A protein has these predicted regions:
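Conserved catalytic and cofactor-binding micro-motifs
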Residues: 1-42, 93, 102
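Feature captures the catalytic cores and cofactor-binding loops of soluble hydro-lyases/lyases
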Residues: 24, 36-48, 53-110
Length: 110
């Protein structure tokens, strides 16, 4: 994956912006995981975190892990109150119809 901003990543037609309070945040690598405690200990700063989890804890884990953005795979969405919290905490959230695997493959080629 070439380093790029979240804004640049979002320009790919496979990604939909749900909230992007920090569009200039740099990306560096990808982490795929749904077990939140596992993600907290393994996702790295500026990673793109791909998940199918869809609750408020996603925002907390993204903040603690300092990922550049969360990508919700398989058209998963977040409730409006969760998106508002993500916006407030500076967490970029995108969605994609792709599976987590296919999203990671796409990102690896960007």
């Amino acid at each position: 994956m070439i380093k790029m901003t979240v804004y640049e990543l979002s320009k790919n037609s496979q990604f939909n912006v749900l909230t992007m309070p920090e569009p200039e945040r740099e990306t560096d690598g990808v982490y795929i995981g749904d077990l939140l405690s596992w993600v907290m200990g393994r996702a790295r700063e500026n990673n793109v975190w791909i998940t199918i989890m869809s609750n408020i804890n996603v925002v907390a884990v993204a903040s603690l892990s300092d990922v550049s953005c969360v990508v919700l795979a398989e058209d998963v969405t977040l409730d409006s109150d969760v998106l508002a919290t993500a916006e407030q905490k500076g967490i970029n959230v995108l969605s994609t119809p792709l599976s987590a695997y296919d999203a990671a493959v796409l990102l690896s080629g960007m």
